[in-house]
Structures are given as structure tokens and as C-alpha cells.
Amino acid sequence: MSTPRPHDLLWGLPLSALPDDTPQWALQVVASGQPVVVRRAACADGWVAVGVRGQSRDQRLGTQMRLGDIQRLRSPEALRGCAPSPWPALQALASAAPVLDTCGLAWGPTGGVGYQLATGINVLHLASDLDLVLRAPHPLTRAKALELLDILDCAPCRIDVQLETPAGAVALREWAGCAQRVLLKSPLGARLVSDPWAALECAA
């Protein structure tokens, strides 16, 4: 099994791993066998930071999971296909797929779309956004980012793309903008950088 990365969905979190003050809704989610999502946070060796997702946006619980407890892993890249759907977010996924495929970079849906495609549990609604991750191991020019954003903004709903660099993640919308520095999210926290691919700058 590959090493879990942010946005991957994991199955196998035992109830015994949850803290004593875990809310009832989170206990029910874990007990029902639903997956947890990998978070971007530092952990001790042998552990991964995960989040439990509830029915509403305010139902989110951060915790940790032993790597040895992972029974199954689904990455966003494995969730790219979807059948015709009345939900704007899934329609946006279908329209964005050929555009992103031409980039030559690995990508996939995260958030509610990824969760629904992975579990079959209906969590989307008419106002749902489409969250995507785009793996960018090498620098993407701001001009290219803006070109891609202009195309994606024609979709049936808002699309938010996270560019995953070797140092962390930055929003495509922010990287396509005019600000000299952008917010880079890493396991050690968030910081403003001028180049999200510059490891030395990100570690400074």
C-alpha cells in the first residue's frame, strides 16, 4: 500500500483510536465503517493525521490513525470517473476532466465530490463546489495557472484547485493572481512564500 497523502481516503480507523471526548456523531461515522480523510499535519512515525467527516460542515473531527490500521486507501486520482449526474459539482467534474487530462499532471476530486464517489453516500447539494487536487512536482508558471483557471471558471459550479508541490499545497486561484507571495500549506503549518516549489524558502 502506498504512503497516505493529503486528501486520500482511508478505511479501518478503530473506535478505540478515538479520544474519550469524541462527539457522538463521529463515533457513529467511524462505527459505520465510513472512511476518514488524510489531513496535512505532522505526526510521529507510524501515524497519519486524519479527519472524520460528518453530515454538516461543522461536523469535522481531527485525529490520528496508525498506519498499521489502514485496511484500504483510495486516492483522488482513483475517483476521476463519474456517471451523468444532476449535481452541478459532478457536471463540473465531467467538464473539467478533459481539460486537466491535457495538463499531463495527476489530478482528482477531493472534498464532498471525492467522498461521494468513494462511498456512494450522498453528501452533495445544488450549491456544492468542486474541490480538486492537481499534483505539480515541477513549477507551473503563473501564466499557465491563469490560463487553466480561466477555462475551469466556465464550469457549472465553482472549482477550487489545490496545487500539490513537493513543499505543500497552494491554491491555483491564488497562484494565478497578482500577489507576490501566496499561502503555502505544509505539515508544519501555513506560510507566505514567493515560490511554492522552492524547498529552501519553504523550510526557512
Question: What residue spans do the PLM features occupy?
Answer:
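Helical scaffold of the NTase/Pol beta-like nucleotidyltransferase catalytic core
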Residues: M1-G112, A145, I151-C157, V161
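Mature, function-bearing regions of proteins
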Residues: G62-Q64, G68-I70, R181-P196
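Active-site nucleotide-donor binding segment shared across nucleotidyl transfer reactions
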Residues: A97-L130, L134-P139
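A short acidic, amphipathic alpha-helical/loop segment
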Residues: G120, E147-L148
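Short, conserved charged micro-motifs
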Residues: P139-E147
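Conserved catalytic core of two-metal-ion nucleotidyltransferases
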Residues: D153-K185, G189
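Expand to "…catalyze enediolate/carbanion chemistry for C-C bond making/breaking, isomerization
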Residues: A204
